[in-house]
């Protein structure tokens, strides 16, 4: 977890440090999971506040939906990592992924937004291979931290190497208000689906 990739300050190491000290038995697994979820929520809050300050109200509303429904998350510490055992949360993960990439498109250059497609796909590839959605959030935290370091360290290189005019032109429609409202509707439905499926 930590700061959003692309912020000028380095990604926060607290999520990774928390995992290490939990594995070492310094803090309990239950407390660690609770703290990590709150770090996650603070990160989402930071993003939606940024969108609100920039006047991107549809995107800020999307972030608000994701933040509000994040309280559905319930984690369990297992061995040396944590899982979210409810399969229903796949809907929330999908909504979160859409929201986060939308944030990237609106706040970063097009090459960096393209880079974050791979970053956001990483935890999905993990669960596709393992057929287990439980560790999705753990893997998202790992990819988030690693990508944040790459983003900040190699931002210039990424902007040069991933510059594709075709992608820039085709993705421009995402900034339209009508598109943002459609994304708001889609993310809201996914998050509500997680709520209903969880029962």
Predicted region positions:
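N-terminal topogenic module of multi-pass integral membrane proteins
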Residues: 1-56, 145, 160-199
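Generic multipass alpha-helical transmembrane bundles of integral membrane proteins
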Residues: 31-146
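Membrane-interacting alpha-helical segments
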Residues: 128-131, 158, 162
